[in-house]
Amino acid sequence: MIYLKPITYDNINDFAGTSYDTMSLEQKHHMIRESVNKIHDESYFEFLVIYEDNTVIGFMNLYAHSEHIISCGPTIKEEFQNRGYGFSAETKALEYAKDRGYTIAVAGVDENNKSSIALHEKLGFELERKYLGREDRTIRLYIKAL
């Protein structure tokens, strides 16, 4: 069974196998500090570690866009992908956000990320619109009432 815990500096070496591994040590420290302080760009931010038993499976970030709207997105380590961890972790993160008073979840998903599209649709997110993101990539904006 998986569970989520706030990240600590003890997790600094747990980024291997994720996109976060390419960050410098200074960037990792900065991100952890923002999570501990629960603020990024003057908005609520929290970075959670996804565990199964005592094994780090991946990470979950939560970012508030307003008092009621939050986005949360899992990053699952390569060796644990395609096993349902993303679904379980995001389900728990959405419950976590709802318990903190958020009423709407949003997700910006790259049009080419088929697994993330499938995940969000399975979780009941609805496609709100598409737009051009960085590098002219098409982004699908999903929305879900909590």
Describe the residue ranges of each PLM region.
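A short beta-loop-alpha structural element at the N-terminal edge
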Residues: 1-15
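Conserved acetyl-CoA pyrophosphate-binding loop and the N-cap/start of the following alpha-helix
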Residues: 80, 84-92
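Acetyl-CoA-dependent GNAT
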Residues: 9, 21-71, 77-79, 146
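Conserved active-site alpha-helix within GNAT-family acetyltransferase domains
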Residues: 87, 111-129
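Active-site acidic-Proline motif in GNAT/NAT acetyltransferases
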Residues: 77-79, 83, 111-112
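Conserved GNAT acetyl-CoA-binding A-motif
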Residues: 97-108
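Conserved catalytic-core motifs of GNAT/GCN5-like acyltransferases
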Residues: 108-109, 124-141
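A conserved beta-turn-beta hairpin within the catalytic core of GNAT-like acetyltransferases
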Residues: 64-72, 81, 101-103, 134-138
